Amino acid sequence: MASAFSAFRVSLSRISPFRDTRFSYPATLALAHTKRIMCNSSHSVSPSPSPSDFSSSSSSSSSSPSTFSLMETSENARWRPMCLYYTHGKCTKMDDPAHLEIFNHDCSKELRVAAADLERKKSQEFNFFLVIDLEGKVEILEFPILIVDAKTMEVVDLFHRFVRPTKMSEQAINKYIEGKYGELGVDRVWHDTAIPFKQVVEEFEVWLAEHDLWDKDTDWGLNDAAFVTCGNWDIKTKIPEQCVVSNINLPPYFMEWINLKDVYLNFYGREARGMVSMMRQCGIKLMGSHHLGIDDTKNITRVVQRMLSEGAVLKLTARRSKSNMRNVEFLFKNRIK
């Protein structure tokens, strides 16, 4: 499987956008979203204390934030929001210079790492990490995932879908989306692209299979990969709840995961209750719109890259019981509760 990822690539470049005028990203939406992002990006964060490596060599893993060069590359001089039609394969503006100037169509550029960042990276138990951060409290509204190569720390590909609730009235959905995504300026793209969770799962499984990360004959887990979450809620609670609502079985690859909060606690010796506090403690600037799932997933990925570059080993922190999948075993004695 590793040979499939021997060269860095982002598979979204293979997508042929649909030629449908419904999916033309309006300039007013672009400006609203960009303005929101510029406001969010202005938050500064404090430098990170020296980490304490729980695995073996705590003294060798301490560093100042300036040694991590992810956000210092020229590509990040002017951060741009992702074209959310493009992430769904529905961008019709790929030949429009003005659109390409405003929107990013390749998140790998803003998440690149330098060769120096690999110097202290340790061998990992998995070859790939799938960073996921769901959005939606009543039902799942957004399902974003980034693949991170554990060896190179590069982003290999992304999967992003907006999810249409199945048990809510149209009136309730409209009110929900206006409140959730309206203030971020992406409510229209949500309505244009959202699909039912069952269809999201079907498309996600095709995507996993294309990357040799899962096959239908496997009854447990992923192939040499692990999900990374910021908390247990996404996979422990929300996905099973959504499967019940959508009347589908819980997919067998959602049986174990890495809660980054627990790894962070044991590696650095300090608590971080969420993504923002992790970034603040590590001296990483918040980019994009907080609570837009794709942006949060990218920010969590940046924390993952930082931790890997400083010598952290990302191990499984939770696993479902095979005899009763409602029961979850937490694998770290020292964990965030």
From Swiss-Prot:
Q: Where is the Exonuclease domain?
A: 129-304
Q: Which residues bind AMP?
A: 135, 291
User: Where does the record place Low complexity bias?
Assistant: 42-66
Q: Which CDD domains does the protein's record reference?
A: ERI-1_3'hExo_like (cd06133)
| Gene Ontology molecular function | 3'-5'-RNA exonuclease activity; metal ion binding; nucleic acid binding; RNA endonuclease activity, producing 5'-phosphomonoesters
GO cellular component assignments: mitochondrion
Superkingdom to which the source organism belongs:
Eukaryota
In this chain, Mg(2+) 1 is annotated as bound at: 133, 135, 296
Q: Which UniProt keywords apply?
A: Exonuclease, Hydrolase, Magnesium, Metal-binding, Nuclease
Q: Where does Mg(2+) 2 bind?
A: 133, 234
Q: Provide the GO biological process annotations.
A: regulatory ncRNA-mediated post-transcriptional gene silencing
The positions flagged as active site in the entry are 135, 291
Pfam families assigned: RNase_T (PF00929)
Q: What class of enzyme is it?
A: hydrolase
> What PANTHER family does the annotation carry?
3'-5' EXONUCLEASE ERI1-RELATED (PTHR23044), 3'-5' EXORIBONUCLEASE 1-RELATED (PTHR23044:SF61)
Name assigned to this protein: Uncharacterized exonuclease domain-containing protein At3g15140
In the record, what lineage is assigned to the organism producing the protein?
Eukaryota, Viridiplantae, Streptophyta, Embryophyta, Tracheophyta
